[in-house]
Amino acid sequence: MKIAFVGASGYGNVGDDTYPLVFQEQFRGAELLFFNSDLPAEMPSDLDLVVLGGGGIIYNSATHDESPSPHFRCMQFYMDHAIASGTPWGFLSCGLQLRARRDEYFRTDLAPWVPYLQQADFITVRSPECVQKIQDITGRKDGVSFFPDAAYLYRTHAPAPPAGGRPMLTVVPAGVINPHNQHNQHMVRLARSLDYEVVWMSMGAPVDDGTHLDNAQLLDPTVRIIRRPGPAAAYAQIGASRLVFTGRYHGMIFARAQGIPFYVSEDAPYKIRMEDLQADPADAQGHVETLKAAMERVQSGAKK
């Protein structure tokens, strides 16, 4: 079976680069192709399924004239291809990516997505709030399910960083978790007073995190910096930590998956704030089961 996954991997964001690894592990018997917003000249003509996800790809940062955003138009390319070719398609382990301080405008911001969300064969999302909002704007009552993010299924055998005998605080910058935030500085000072080693680690693209890491190094030349760890190294670093401060969604996921205490700010992005921290991370397997059911439907149709 040939499946095209459309996400945001390949740009250096550790969380987005984790999804292909999870899907490759879970669907070893299938031929998997991965695409993102660098659109191909054409899509393969022999696809059996088109999957949008994982990640927070359901968003529309509208322009000043309220026209669909470039991101939406890129995703539209793939959805239109699936519809025109009659290829079954849907969303897997996705999230709504609402703009800061615009939560109440989600109906307007997500309007271009509505006809596509209504037509998708399956939709799995990573928070109960996402389910409610999709049902609100589409009117559909079935085919939309919540499971914890698929990245909870990620495992690696990468060696842990060498232990220096001191507890370790790992800081994953984004948003207010940054070197110049006064509250963050205060928390780091408290950790140092308890003899914690402080490590700053990027989990975003270099264009997003480079300045934060440079500033952390300027403020404290002795601090350890991890610039481009990749999923395996990031997972191992977080697993070796006593505590994690993170502004990145997958910094929280990697910590929670390994039972590492973590802190996120009250002003965290929508996807972090909406995470159901009571849900069992093992329930992320629901995304896999949903896609397996879609694959079985395709195979049954082919047999007929």
Outline where the language-model segments fall.
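Active-site anion-handling motifs in enzyme catalytic cores
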Residues: 1-304
